[in-house]
Amino acid sequence: MKFATIILLAGLMAARGAEVTARPTAEFLDSIGVDTTFPDRGQPLEKTIEMIRYGGFRWVRGGIEGLTEHGPTTLRTYLELHERTGVKFSWGLVSGGTDLEKLLGTARELAEAGALLAFEGNNEPNNWGVKYKGEDGGGRAKSWLAVAKLQRDLYAAVKGDAVLRKYPVWSISENGAEVDNVGLQFLTIPTGAGTLMPEGTRFADCANVHNYIYHPASPHPMDNKTWNAAEPGPACKVDGLYGNYGRTWGRHFAGYSESELASLPKVTTETGCTIDGEVTEEMQGLNLLSMYLDQFKRGWNHTSVYLLRDRTDEGGNQSFGFFDRDYTPRKAALYLHNLTTILGKGEGGREGAAEELNYTIDGETGTVHDLLLENSAGVFQLIVWDERLTGKDEVTVKLNGKKDSVVVYDPTAGVKAVWAGEWASEIGLTLSNHPVVVEIGALR
């Protein structure tokens, strides 16, 4: 990436831009999560800790599957991971689980340690059915009523617990596959929905989606690939929010309207892509970097990528990981490490009210996106990224008045600044397929 001339002339008229309210840098960093293997599947805790620290992940998708009193994966495994990295956990029933007593009991210990983030319903009941109170649901069963009743009871149990009620409950994943209209396409079933479960049934506080970047309906790299995967409406070409909460992809049951989906609380507990065919290691690295940014920009509260490290206990194409099976970091790990390191500078200081910055981006095309953050040291961090498959865009960031310090970073190049200047009012950037971070007001 090259940088065009930085305009420093004192006599330039200030650009008339738009006042944009910055979001806390910590809020974006806290959204960055990952799915991982634990000792019960052959991944030592020490190695997991090293990889979590390197990537800068803030939360991990966890749950009671594979969790036993005597190990190799115990609750102490999770607590130690939290103590040594600071990560929090979404805590779920995972695949086919129904033990609410175990879920809540272990969650109380996580909450006491400050390690609990949220609760999660069943993982993909279309693939892993449940048997709840003698009733089969999901999988090959003819109904999803058992899945719905379990999720209803999970929600009620959490909200009825004096310790746990403050934690959000995330819905099941792949509710778009329901074979009968039990109502899981809603967080709370509205009046007149015509579902099998009654109106007013509460399932969750937050929608949960597995919007993998590549899908049979969108199998190839393209411009705005991850921006589209994060799309909340029907324009999404992958297994996104609309197909699970707008109109279900399986039997086309009606859910929320497009306007309601735009503001629906939502998380992703699985996304990602394998290295295969057109998707090279470089492409995977760029996709995962922009996916975290796109998700946050488009209103997703938390995003977990599958997978931290390639599986060693499964067959097939095991190349989802940020790390290879021998723990070698791929470019995805390197690029994320660089981004979280760049943004993490100055964190841990004061927490103040959100501030505004007046700026415009001239030359911004449909593949160029931006996100304004402010760290706890009061430094603005403007992330500008492009999602072109080929070619470049020349853009100019115009600030309303000259700023005493501007520093530019490229996370695909490293953690050191690629340009720094004083009293700048315009910053020219040549963008292509990855983000740059423009620090404004940084103390150097």
Predicted regions: what they are:
Residues 46-52, 59-116, 138-172:
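Aromatic-lined substrate-binding rim segments of carbohydrate-active enzymes
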Residues 6-17:
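Hydrophobic h-region of N-terminal signal peptides that target proteins for export
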Residues 419-444:
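C-terminal beta-strand-rich structural cap/linker in extracellular carbohydrate-active enzymes
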Residues 18-66:
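Boundary/entry segment of secreted carbohydrate-active catalytic domains
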Residues 358-404, 411:
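Carbohydrate-binding surface patches
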Residues 272-364:
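Aromatic/acidic polysaccharide-binding cleft in carbohydrate-active enzymes
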Residues 94, 100-108, 143-291, 298:
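Noncatalytic carbohydrate-binding groove/subsite architecture in carbohydrate-active enzymes
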Residues 30-36, 60-62, 87-93, 117-121, ...:
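Hydrophobic faces of well-ordered beta-strands that scaffold small-molecule active sites
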